[in-house]
């Protein structure tokens, strides 16, 4: 493989952007393991007092990721996130106002490999969410196992991440006077295995849990499509039925999360590495679908609302696709 090295005279701003994204990729892939290593080092060093205090803290704080988390605006305002946003860049696009007197479920599509658009828009304060949607607070739900990792869980909660459990979503949406948004990556880990450049496959036909929660809480549904999310990385070919895909799906069932074999560019060269490509991400927030609170919705009501959501998502995509580089003949594929 011939390596294409980055030029030496790159502007400082671009170097800072690369550094910001590198620390984010590192945090996503290795920070949790490092935190576990720190915890084990405390055990080996027999620092029992520190361990006892932290274990007590874990016991008292264990349910916090399912109770709205513990965001810290200072962390969400770190300058590193501005450079992170500018690397791609990431842009949040509003199609209509959202009434802060309601609670909402935003369905985020597609998952992509590392969900960069969801993190940049809803876990930092640099893409204008507060200005576009005043009076609303976003909560991005991620897999619960991240919050079982010592030390890492505190960092994750600081940026507004919460657990992707039914209890957690219900807690966010139970705010009496409205103003909360649960952002759920509907396709989940399974969808990340289809996150190839140009792919428009969404795993959504069997995903109806968010519909049931919307009925229970009376939360309005908002489809969100992030154009460019699947263009950030290449993946090793893994078509359905291939040996690699079978192994990945098996590991996902065992561990609860997927392991896409991805690559893109490096820090000092453009040919290979785990850094994402500099590709623009446009996250478009659609119009809300009103939902009447219903404690025990019938199967017909669930199916009807699910179909309404699919139709709204498809309409959102069709309305904006050509503006963001999708050919006219391309359409979403629901599986």
Curated annotation (Swiss-Prot):
- Which parts of the chain span the membrane according to its record? 24-44, 47-67
Q: Which GO terms describe its molecular function?
A: 2-acylglycerol O-acyltransferase activity
Q: Does the keyword Transferase apply?
A: yes
Q: Where in the cell is it found?
A: Endoplasmic reticulum membrane
| Membrane topology reported for the UniProt record | Multi-pass membrane protein
A Gene Ontology biological process term: triglyceride biosynthetic process
Q: Which GO terms describe its cellular component?
A: endoplasmic reticulum membrane
Which pathway or pathways does this protein act in? Glycerolipid metabolism; triacylglycerol biosynthesis
Keywords from UniProt, A to Z, are: Acyltransferase, Endoplasmic reticulum, Glycerol metabolism, Glycoprotein, Lipid biosynthesis, Lipid metabolism, Membrane, Transferase, Transmembrane, Transmembrane helix
Q: Which reaction does it catalyse?
A: a 2-acylglycerol + an acyl-CoA = a 1,2-diacylglycerol + CoA; a 2-acylglycerol + an acyl-CoA = a 1,2-diacyl-sn-glycerol + CoA; a 2-acylglycerol + an acyl-CoA = a 2,3-diacyl-sn-glycerol + CoA; a 1-acylglycerol + an acyl-CoA = a 1,2-diacylglycerol + CoA
Q: What is the enzyme's class at the highest EC level?
A: transferase
Keyword Lyase tagged: no
Record-listed E.C. numbers: 2.3.1.22
What family name appears in the similarity comment?
Belongs to the diacylglycerol acyltransferase family.
What is this protein's function? Involved in glycerolipid synthesis and lipid metabolism. Catalyzes the formation of diacylglycerol, the precursor of triacylglycerol, by transferring the acyl chain of a fatty acyl-CoA to a monoacylglycerol, mainly at the sn-1 or sn-3 positions. It uses both sn-2-monoacylglycerol (2-acylglycerol) and sn-1-monoacylglycerol (1-acyl-sn-glycerol) equally well as substrates, and uses sn-3-monoacylglycerol (3-acyl-sn-glycerol) with lower efficiency.
Official protein name in the record: 2-acylglycerol O-acyltransferase 1
